[in-house]
Amino acid sequence: ANLVSVITAILSLALSLYLVRSIRALHRKVNRNADRVSKELSGQTGRIKSELADVYHQFEAIEQLLPLLKLSAPLPPSRGWAASPDFLLTLAHVTKSIRPRFTVELGSGTSTLVLAKSGARKIISLDHSPEFGSQTREMLAAHKVRGVEILIHELESYPSGYKWYAKSTLKGLAKIDLLIIDGPPSSTNPDARYPALEHLVPLLSPKATVILDDVYRDEERKLADAIVKALPNHVLT
């Protein structure tokens, strides 16, 4: 009986030690998971705050933009493939400030309308998409805008390996006062907009302004730096 009692006591002690260790291990695991969940929640909260701040920023931009344009028809939706309100507001402010005689835009859309409504005199917009180019033409017609030429042609392969706007659409371009680089889309090539440096920057007028969209991307920042080096006396926005 004494032996049984001793064995029972030993087993009970072993079981107790096992349970204590298991509980401690579980506690550590719970703490690790809690830390991970806390970090994930903190990250999500930060992203949500950032997105809300951007939404508010874009709302402020569209509120400031609309009174500047005096539109006679609805403004198409922005964001997504279309230009963001803050970018459109920049276009409006710059155009009203410098009053360009000749504007070249890479990638047509709502931005084309904003340029025209802000006082750009002659605008040529290059677009590789028949769908988007046609939509822009219809939008301009709805707003009774004139003096804008939408040149639609699929992207063309260049010796450098890039696919860019067709050479035929570049004929006659010279003394560009305002250059908007917002195409081709990066889906065609991460450096899809880089050929503008070679083919359009040399065609700028002495006091031209260059506006480059999507500069949060590495490729666009690289292009911006290259343009700054090529044109130290020009303005890059």
Which ranges hold each PLM region?
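Conserved SAM-binding loop of SAM-dependent methyltransferases across substrates and taxa
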Residues: 110-120
